[in-house]
Amino acid sequence: MAGIPKKLKAALLAVTIAGGGVGGYQEMTRQSLIHLENIAYMPYRDIAGVLTVCVGHTGPDIEMRRYSHAECMALLDSDLKPVYAAIDRLVRVPLTPYQKTALATFIFNTGVTAFSKSTLLKKLNAGDYAGARDQMARWVFAAGHKWKGLMNRREVEMAIWNIRGADDLRQ
């Protein structure tokens, strides 16, 4: 499946084969975010100048120190709770586990508030799945600039959205 790096594709396939394809979109989301965001054990400033650590964690609780892997995973799980809650609360149409995964990584990056007001959500709730997916490609700006890294990320999210099952991941 074009657009998904081999390492991420292998991780998604492993979760799918383990039975995560039906109800385990959370683990696919974790794996996707680890790939898309990477893990930074030391705080840094992202492309928009926001202090960030671990797997895209931001906020006033960041300390200028080295974080452990376990701390990073705990922060990621905590950061994902409002994302999953937003999907459950705002999305009114059925989604495949892969669509939920793509949507969760998108919301993690753009924020729940932005998603809740987006054309993407309006299209999705109107049943326009392709139109909703295509809206992801518009979200490629940070700090007023178009970023290649965000374009690449959206390409991956859109490709995950299109996965139908394990056979797609084996290609």
From Swiss-Prot:
Can you tell me which residues form the catalytic site? 37 (proton donor/acceptor), 46 (proton donor/acceptor)
Identify one Pfam family in the record: Phage_lysozyme
Write out the catalysed reaction. Answer: Hydrolysis of (1->4)-beta-linkages between N-acetylmuramic acid and N-acetyl-D-glucosamine residues in a peptidoglycan and between N-acetyl-D-glucosamine residues in chitodextrins
Which EC class heads this enzyme's classification? hydrolase
Signal peptide per UniProt: none
What is one GO cellular-component annotation here? Answer: membrane
- Kindly give the InterPro entries that the UniProt entry links to this protein: Bacteriophage_GH24, Endolysin_T4_type, Glyco_hydro_24, Lysozyme-like_dom_sf, Lysozyme_dom_sf, SAR_endolysin-like
What is the membrane topology here?
A: Single-pass type II membrane protein
Cellular localization per UniProt: Host cell inner membrane
Q: Per its UniProt record, what HAMAP family does this chain match? A: ENDOLYSIN_T4, SAR_ENDOLYSIN
UniProt-recorded name of the protein? SAR-endolysin
